[in-house]
Design a protein with these regions (language model features):
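Residues at the C-termini of beta-strands that transition into short coil/loop
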Residues: 9, 46, 69-71, 111, ...
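Short, surface-exposed amphipathic charged segments that create phosphate/polyanion-binding patches used
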Residues: 58-59, 122-126, 178
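A short, structured surface patch at a secondary-structure boundary
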Residues: 24-82, 86-92
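Extracytoplasmic substrate-binding proteins
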Residues: 12, 96-173
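Extracellular/periplasmic catalytic domains that process cell-envelope and extracellular macromolecules
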Residues: 15-17, 37, 60-61, 80-81, ...
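Short periplasmic/luminal acceptor-recognition loop of GT-C membrane glycosyltransferases, typified by
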Residues: 21-25, 161
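N-terminal hydrophobic or amphipathic helices and topogenic motifs
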Residues: 1-16
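Alpha-helical, coiled-coil/dimerization segments enriched in small aliphatic residues
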Residues: 172-182
């Protein structure tokens, strides 16, 4: 450190010192930070963290952290008040990033909406949090699981599947979302 990385919006971001406190405004980035083993560095997480089963099983302490909102209603002031060394947000918050930076926050945007994007997010977050070895292990585990799954279903007819949305059974993942790759 200082370390310059390129986030998933193509922005060059310089992280001046190794981040010791993180804020994640996106459940996918929060989940990846757990997988990278840096959940203890989180000081703020996305809304509804207290309802996520994954967190209750893998990092229950996250359920009591302050909420920094959602991609639709991000709490800029609340996030800034936590003084995180690094903030991770979904790419859809790109219009809010300049304001966050004006508030003195270092911000990375992630867009893990397909397999390449997921691996890019893992690599970006692993690099930013100095956990590249763990990031490589995580990618290899995912690749291994996907290969085993492909082998297990080889030669079978793929069924039509409707994946109900998180908020409503009448909503589903669009073509640009990771879930559509399943």
């Amino acid at each position: 450190y200082p370390l310059t990385v390129t986030d998933q919006l193509g922005r060059e971001v310089t992280i001046e010192t190794e981040p010791k406190t993180l804020a994640s405004g996106y459940y996918i980035s929060t989940s990846l930070l757990i997988a990278l083993g840096v959940q203890d560095e989180l000081v703020g997480v996305e809304a509804k963290a207290d309802k996520r089963t994954l967190y209750s099983l893998s990092a229950p302490e996250l359920q009591s952290l302050p909420s920094i909102g959602t991609a639709k209603e991000f709490d800029l002031e609340g996030c800034a008040a936590l003084t995180p060394d690094l903030v991770i947000v979904p790419a859809k918050l790109k219009d809010s990033i300049p304001q966050m930076e004006e508030m003195g926050l270092t911000v990375l945007a992630v867009k893990p909406e397909n397999q390449a994007g997921l691996f890019g997010a893992i690599e970006l977050l692993a690099q930013a949090t100095n956990t590249t070895a763990r990031g490589e292990e995580l990618e290899m585990a995912i690749e291994s699981n996907l290969a085993a799954l492909a082998e297990a279903v080889a030669g079978t007819d793929a069924p039509s599947v409707y994946l109900a949305g998180n908020s409503s059974v009448l909503e589903t993942a669009g073509r640009a979302m990771y879930q559509n790759t399943m």
